[in-house]
A protein has these predicted regions:
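Short hydrophobic alpha-helical segments enriched in small aliphatic residues
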Residues: 14-16, 35, 41-44, 56
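Extended, low-hydrophobicity, polar/charged segments
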Residues: 57-60, 64-250
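Leucine-biased recognition of intrinsically disordered, low-complexity hydrophobic segments
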Residues: 21, 26-29, 46, 50
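Intrinsic disorder/low-complexity segments
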Residues: 9-11, 53-55
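Intrinsic-disorder-associated, low-complexity terminal segments enriched in Asp/Asn/His/Tyr and depleted
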Residues: 39-43, 49, 60
Length: 250
């Protein structure tokens, strides 16, 4: 795991490139636990409790102070673009391509190394004291139409299930939709089972993202079981072919 900075930390703070930033107020650099709790309380009442304020654009801090990932527990991730070795090759390539395209928030993506035995969402949530609603799962669904197989990567909050029989089936325009077998999912994605992620999926697949994942942070797979990726909803929405779908997660 990426070394801790030392001392108990109720939340994680994020670095971002200077060019993207608006200088934070001095008070934000010396947050007390009460100030952090107030910051977290801004999110309550929303569907996932993880969405950023809706007024204006989200900005990123110049130092380790202003951005908090609610519900991250004891994990302490680091900038993903500086640790591409912790990502599966297609994931590293896709994240790098986003940054090269000028998607500013791509540089805010974070990664953390974990024990592969803790990769499953419920196990990881329990082990690190995370909020289950922070995690978003990527589920592969397939169906056929006139002999053509159609595949969708569906991203939903871990507190919900993908509506395969209605929403996904309608989007794919197939008579029957079902989960893809593990062996085929691993082979076609180039990722490990338990680490499959929307970042870097093949361009021929549909990429359906529940609207609840398009705001706030998500903990998602890195393509490997030995690490996890943290991205904002802006990053997910900027992925090639991404479709934001209301009601995908139920």
């Amino acid at each position: 795991m990426i070394p801790s900075r030392g001392g108990p930390a109720p939340s994680i703070h994020v670095f971002a490139p200077r060019a993207q930033l608006r200088r934070p107020q001095l008070a934000s650099l010396t947050q007390t636990p009460h100030a952090q709790r107030t910051h977290h309380d801004r999110y309550t009442g929303l569907r996932t409790d993880l969405a950023p304020p809706t007024h204006g654009k989200q900005t990123y801090p110049e130092t380790m102070s202003d951005i908090i990932i609610p519900g991250i527990g004891s994990l302490e991730p680091a900038p993903a673009l500086d640790h591409l070795d912790l990502l599966a090759p297609p994931v590293a390539a896709a994240l790098t391509a986003l940054a090269e395209r000028g998607v500013a928030t791509a540089s805010s993506a974070l990664v953390v190394a974990i024990d592969p035995e803790l990769a499953d969402t419920e196990v990881m949530t329990r082990e690190f004291g995370m909020d289950l609603a922070l995690s978003s799962n990527c589920i592969l669904v397939a169906g056929k139409r006139a002999g053509e197989e159609r595949i969708a990567a569906c991203v939903v909050r871990a507190t919900t299930n993908a509506d395969v029989n209605h929403v996904v089936k309608k989007r794919l325009d197939v008579r029957k939709a079902s989960f893809w077998p593990q062996e085929r999912a691993v082979e076609a994605s180039g990722m490990e089972y338990g680490g499959i992620t929307p970042v870097g999926v093949p361009g021929s697949w549909r990429l359906l993202i529940d609207s609840a994942c398009s705001v706030g942070w998500s903990c998602i797979g890195s393509g490997l079981r030995r690490s996890k990726l943290f991205v904002t909803g802006e990053v997910l929405a900027a992925l090639p072919g991404a479709e934001i779908v209301e009601g995908l997660g139920v």
